[in-house]
Regions:
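Arg/Gly-rich low-complexity intrinsically disordered repeat tracts
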Residues: 243-262
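Conserved donor-nucleotide/metal-binding helix-loop-beta segment in metal-dependent transferases, i.e.
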Residues: 114-139
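Catalytic-core segments of class I nucleotidyltransferases/pyrophosphorylases
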Residues: 120-121, 149-243
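Conserved N-terminal catalytic core of the sugar/cofactor nucleotidyltransferase
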Residues: 2-6, 14-17, 28, 32-107, ...
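Phosphate- and divalent-cation-binding pockets in alpha/beta enzyme and binding domains
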Residues: 14, 61-62, 115, 179, ...
Length: 262
């Protein structure tokens, strides 16, 4: 079984002053709140049990917007992340909830055109990252690959070893939590997801897939605008971004109640 986690914390400082009044993941991307898009990525991949991790001041806003998930045919659980401990720390909060299941982790500001259902269905153990060819690789975590192996990941390198950016979508087995517990904070005082991924690489259990469609991390004004324009363009030729809760998404959860974990 695969569970899903949407990480929707952070201060959104690059989107001030908008994020002084709301969480950045609630800002509009074309005609829907940003968080609808990562949720849709998980839903179309067949994942129905999803946790949203956010800060104390924002969890209530997500609960008001999304509720139990019944409207979207899913079961939602909410987890509070105190402070800014990093992506890996936020993921670690879900250990009890995930149990022994595999988990798909997606950053709440990442928007994907690709359908990842095949990648999820073929995943069994270890870890898997999703890469995208970019022209400005120095802005991202960059994967060095050879054949079907990932040799390493370097965060925002001055001289990238490839043009393959590591997107904000990761698949892990339950062993990820033991790795997180062994991490030490980086120079910025956070537990880094790149360190988690490199641990799997050293074990030889990291897989990868290269995305073909549009991808954006809508964390700046420029990328937010670009994401809105691209979503609108995709709308014109398909229903890929119809979004959770639209008529094509059937409700299948019954009277599920949202769980808020603290």
């Amino acid at each position: 079984m695969m569970k899903g986690i949407v990480l929707a914390g952070g201060t959104g400082s690059r989107l001030h002053p908008l994020t002084k009044v709301t969480n950045k993941h609630l800002l509009p991307v074309y005609d829907k709140p940003m968080i609808y898009y990562p949720l849709q990525t998980l839903i179309t991949a067949g994942i129905k049990d999803i946790m949203i991790v956010s800060g104390r001041g924002h969890v209530g806003h997500f609960l008001e917007l999304l509720g139990s998930g019944k409207e979207f045919g899913i079961q939602l659980t909410y987890e509070i992340q105190e402070g800014a401990g990093g992506i890996a720390q936020a993921l670690g909060l879900a250990e009890e909830w995930v149990g022994m299941d595999n988990v798909a982790v997606i950053l709440g500001d990442n928007i994907f055109q690709d359908d990842i259902q095949g990648g999820i269905e073929s995943f069994e153990s270890g870890a898997k990252i999703f890469l995208k060819e970019v022209s400005d690789a120095h802005r991202f975590g960059v994967a060095e690959v050879k054949g079907n192996k990932v040799l390493g990941i370097e965060e925002k390198p001055k001289i990238p070893k490839s043009n393959l950016a590591v997107t904000g979508l990761y698949l892990y087995d339950a062993g990820v939590f033991a790795i997180i517990k062994m991490l030490k904070p980086s120079s910025r005082g956070e537990l880094e997801i790149t360190d988690v991924n490199n641990a799997y690489i050293r074990r030889g259990t990291m897989e990868f897939a290269v995305l073909k469609g549009f991808w954006s991390d809508a964390g700046t004004f420029e990328s937010l605008l670009r994401a809105s324009v691209m979503v609108r363009g995709v709308y014109a030729i398909s229903d890929r971004f119809a979004g959770p809760g639209t008529p094509d998404v059937e409700s299948r959860v019954g009277d599920a109640k949202p769980g808020i974990r603290e």
